């Protein structure tokens, strides 16, 4: 059975980049002055991307997808019709400077599917409940995160800059709704109208059978940005598609630049011969 782990990770990278475009990165400033212009919030956030070293995330997905839109991936699992994604979650930590991450995901409605993915020291370790109880080892995946070299370029920042230019050129509009609380902290609430043409372009860029012929009909994006640091706090994306289905994705980012420990699994937890 083939599970498109790398495609999912690439999509996660695009989603995170879109979130940063909409609501910013770390400014490295303990207390930022009040900002009322949503475009300025976006600009200030994007310029602080290089200061982000580590971050924790919690994600949740609800809604349903049409199995036919997944191409061979859905057929390989023996599924058909709509698949409800309620209670699907993912959480983890990124150590950007070390190109390391640890992600745990769960999809209870699909045979209690769970996955644990660790990338550290140039290798990726993947454990999927439907496949086995041990990790498989492979070369590290290519994600838009920086290397540990002192003079390395923050790849995610380049992705953000490119997406920001695309958003501006396509007529995306940001509106400051007000202030909310996220993780017990004040946060700016910004809505961004993202043209569906741009969303479909990014989906198509993922490649593969699952992306072929997929069209998003409407999308709403809400972002929250921590007032004190201009770090992205929360993303909520709602997408509707006649071909794919209806999805709501919520992403919460916390624990910026706090120490994280990401380690490879013990040899006894890795498939023999790898």
Residue ranges: model-predicted function:
Residues 1-21:
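Sec-dependent bacterial lipoprotein signal peptides
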Residues 3, 23-274:
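Subset-of-secretome marker
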């Amino acid at each position: 059975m083939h599970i498109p782990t790398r495609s999912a990770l690439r999509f996660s990278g695009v989603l995170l980049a879109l979130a940063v475009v909409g609501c910013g990165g770390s400014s490295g400033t303990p207390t930022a002055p009040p900002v009322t212009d949503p475009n300025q919030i976006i600009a200030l956030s994007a310029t602080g991307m290089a200061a982000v070293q580590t971050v924790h995330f919690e994600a949740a997905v609800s809604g349903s997808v049409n199995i036919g839109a997944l191409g061979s991936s859905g057929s390989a699992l023996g599924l058909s019709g709509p698949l409800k994604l309620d209670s699907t979650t993912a959480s983890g930590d990124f150590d950007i400077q070390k190109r390391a991450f640890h992600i745990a995901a769960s999809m209870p409605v699909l045979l209690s599917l769970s996955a644990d993915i660790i990338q550290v020291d140039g290798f990726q370790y993947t454990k999927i409940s439907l496949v086995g109880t041990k990790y498989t080892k492979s070369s590290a995946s290519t994600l838009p995160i920086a290397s540990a070299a002192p003079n390395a370029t923050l790849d995610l920042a380049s992705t953000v800059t490119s997406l920001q230019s695309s958003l501006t050129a396509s007529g995306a509009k940001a509106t400051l709704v007000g202030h909310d609380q996220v993780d017990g902290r004040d946060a700016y609430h910004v809505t961004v109208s993202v043209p569906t043409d741009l969303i479909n372009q990014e989906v198509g860029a993922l490649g593969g059978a699952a992306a072929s012929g997929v069209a998003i009909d409407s999308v709403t994006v809400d972002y929250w940005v921590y007032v004190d640091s201009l770090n992205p706090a929360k993303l909520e994306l709602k997408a509707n598609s006649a071909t794919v289905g209806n999805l709501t994705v919520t992403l919460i980012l916390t624990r910026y630049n706090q120490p994280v420990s990401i380690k490879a699994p013990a040899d006894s937890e890795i498939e023999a011969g790898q």
